[in-house]
């Protein structure tokens, strides 16, 4: 009976989760190894200005980046005895001043205010969890800021059709050869997937250490979107070789989104191969960044016409559009009304 109620509750959350403010989901805010643990770490979730610092027991405290004394920002303060000290008058900020919670998962920091889930989304495929705990895969991390709203960044990361045009160069995987075996997977109202076979270009084969260049082989691909801010994909070739690209996003302005990218592989695990993968990933991200800079930021036109034209292989995009229909960018006034 308990299991029944648990499943019922989980389904209710998945149905209504896209009406819940973004700040109540776990938002990736940083790659832990990139954060100086001896200094306060400044971050934003939408318009909500926040600051975090690490304590002696390796936990994190977060609060608004605002001293409730004379209103100083706290990012130029310092950490002393697990307190964040305001640089203006030395006011101490501790756990009693906390705003939201921070946890560490998959070598990343995640923040949420009154979270609806106990932990960030797990990335699983064929009963395999892709995380830093899985020693069969090497993991590397990078980040980039894109000049685009988060929903459109999500559409891009799940879109199949733009690769032919945006990623067709020497460091791209795009091809004029059509994909095969497209399938749309709808799991619930907060998670969807798509699978397809993609032509394996010669330049990509070389990077992926596949030296047989004559065959017209295809890779097996699976992409998944987990509302509100996670997408990931696994590319399989040569039976057992897997490359996983996992992106967690957080909006930092209405048309500015920070991407935290995880690169995983079970066959390119040495340092040279990892650096090659990271370099190619940055090239591909740079190609997307150029397109995002070309995107119109006219809100009236977007609200009226965005996604009114459709292409093949966009069933999953149509569902994403429905899921995002009630999404709203996190405004500070809305957050403070619920604080």
Where are these regions (language model features)?
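N-terminal chloroplast transit peptides
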Residues: 3-18
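C-terminal catalytic domain of Rieske-type non-heme iron oxygenases
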Residues: 59, 117-339
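Hydrophobic, proline/glycine-rich low-complexity stretches
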Residues: 18-25, 31
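A short, structural micro-pattern
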Residues: 23, 95-96, 106, 243, ...
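Rieske [2Fe-2S] iron-sulfur-binding domain
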Residues: 28-136, 338-339
């Amino acid at each position: 009976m308990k299991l029944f109620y648990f499943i019922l509750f989980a389904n209710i959350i998945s149905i209504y989760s896209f009406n819940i403010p973004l700040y109540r989901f776990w938002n990736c805010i940083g790659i832990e190894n990139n954060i100086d643990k001896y200094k306060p770490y400044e971050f934003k979730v939408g318009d909500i200005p926040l600051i975090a610092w690490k304590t002696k027991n390796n936990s994190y405290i977060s609060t608004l980046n605002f001293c409730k004394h004379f209103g100083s920002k706290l990012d130029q303060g310092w950490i002393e005895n697990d307190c964040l000290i305001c640089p203006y008058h030395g006011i101490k900020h501790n756990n009693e001043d906390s705003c939201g919670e921070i946890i560490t998962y998959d070598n990343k920091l995640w923040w949420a205010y009154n979270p609806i889930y106990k932990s960030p989304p797990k990335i699983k495929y064929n009963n395999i969890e892709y995380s830093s705990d899985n020693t069969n895969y090497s993991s590397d991390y990078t980040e980039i800021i894109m000049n685009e709203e988060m929903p459109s960044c999500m559409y891009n990361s799940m879109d199949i059709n733009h690769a032919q045009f945006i990623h067709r160069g020497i460091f791209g995987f795009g091809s004029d050869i059509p994909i095969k075996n497209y399938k749309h997977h709808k799991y619930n109202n907060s998670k969807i997937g798509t699978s397809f076979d993609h032509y394996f270009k010669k330049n990509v084969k070389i990077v992926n250490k596949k030296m047989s260049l004559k065959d017209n082989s295809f890779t097996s691909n699976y992409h998944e979107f987990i509302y509100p801010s996670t997408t990931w994909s696994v590319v399989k070739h040569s039976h057992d070789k897997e490359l996983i690209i996992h992106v967690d996003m957080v909006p930092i302005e209405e048309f500015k989104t920070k991407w935290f990218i995880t690169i995983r592989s079970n066959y390119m695990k040495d340092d040279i191969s990892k650096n090659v993968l990271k370099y190619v990933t940055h090239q591909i991200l740079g190609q997307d960044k150029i397109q995002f800079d070309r995107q119109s930021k006219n809100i009236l036109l977007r609200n009226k016409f965005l996604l009114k034209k459709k292409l093949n292989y966009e069933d999953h995009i149509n569902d994403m559009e429905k899921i995002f229909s009630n999404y709203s960018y996190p405004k500070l006034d809305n957050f403070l009304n619920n604080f």
